[in-house]
């Protein structure tokens, strides 16, 4: 029986841990060769070893997605080592700055857009030419439920703004590429038990806002968070469909 991603090359950003790592492992289990990209080399090496331990093929790309030059170089390296990218999962993200907007550093705000919005754009630019030449490609931009309800989590203005912008970019790009064989979709992964969630819970309530801190604390203590593997499988169950410009959620699969 042929695996669903047999013969495909996938590039996953934010692949060192959490959802990105889980997606990379599931793609590999489905037959894909995977390029793992993140900032932490130690996390990337561990993720790559996990892929190889199950018979998969992985290459490690250490890069800061907020740097357009690094993005272009990483995408080129992925193609050099594995071949043209068929599947792009833009998962890397930052939740900072958090807390009152009036005290948010301008540099941190700009960095949030560089990582959460600009990087997916630059990665798409890098891989689209070969996808369009071959008439097949899959791009998934990982968003958040905050884009559906931007006012729901006070204290996360930058995250709400960037994820909303990412979804608009995704849907518009999908319309631009309609009929090309390349699909572009949004994935809202649900509330997942990740290091990012743990970091938020570790922050002083007075710095990020007591209500926001309580939201994340209660979600964790009530056991309502899902595993990265659960979320990854939900995403990939929808990946090979021909629909484009959609907003997937963890419950759609």
Segments predicted by a language model, with ranges:
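Conserved glycine-rich Rossmann-like NAD(P)H-binding loop of the short-chain dehydrogenase/reductase
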Residues: 32-46
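The beta1-alpha1 cofactor-binding region of Rossmann-like NAD(H)/NADP(H)-dependent oxidoreductases
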Residues: 42, 62-73, 106
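C-terminal helical subdomain
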Residues: 179-182, 186, 194, 205-253
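A short, exposed helix-loop element centered on a Lys and neighboring polar residues
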Residues: 124-125, 171
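Conserved glycine-rich cofactor-binding loop
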Residues: 9, 16-17
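Catalytic loop of short-chain dehydrogenase/reductase
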Residues: 140-165, 170-171, 175-179, 191
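Substrate-binding pocket helix/loop in short-chain dehydrogenase/reductase
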Residues: 99-101, 108-110
């Amino acid at each position: 029986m042929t695996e669903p991603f047999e013969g495909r090359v996938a590039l996953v950003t934010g692949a060192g841990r959490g959802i990105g790592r889980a997606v990379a492992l599931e793609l590999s289990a489905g037959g894909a060769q995977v390029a793992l990209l993140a900032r932490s080399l130690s996390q990337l090496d561990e993720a790559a070893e996990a892929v190889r331990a199950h018979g998969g093929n992985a290459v490690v790309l250490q890069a800061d997605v907020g740097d357009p030059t690094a993005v272009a170089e990483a995408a080129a390296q992925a193609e050099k080592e594995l071949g043209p990218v068929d599947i792009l999962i833009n998962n890397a993200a930052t939740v900072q700055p958090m807390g009152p907007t009036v005290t948010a550093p301008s540099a941190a705000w700009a960095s949030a857009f560089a990582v959460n919005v600009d990087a997916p754009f630059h990665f798409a630019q890098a891989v689209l030419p070969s996808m369009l030449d071959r008439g097949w490609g899959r791009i998934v931009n990982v968003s958040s439920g905050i884009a559906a309800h931007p006012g729901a989590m006070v204290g996360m203005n930058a995250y709400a703004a960037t994820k909303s912008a990412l979804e608009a970019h995704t849907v518009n790009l999908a319309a631009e590429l309609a009929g090309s064989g390349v699909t572009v979709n949004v994935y809202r992964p649900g509330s997942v038990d990740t290091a990012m969630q743990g970091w938020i819970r570790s922050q002083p309530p007075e710095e990020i806002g007591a209500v926001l801190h309580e939201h994340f604390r209660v979600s964790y203590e009530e056991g309502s968070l899902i595993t990265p593997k659960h979320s990854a499988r939900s995403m990939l169950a929808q990946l090979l469909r021909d629909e484009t410009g959609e907003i997937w959620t963890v419950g759609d699969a």
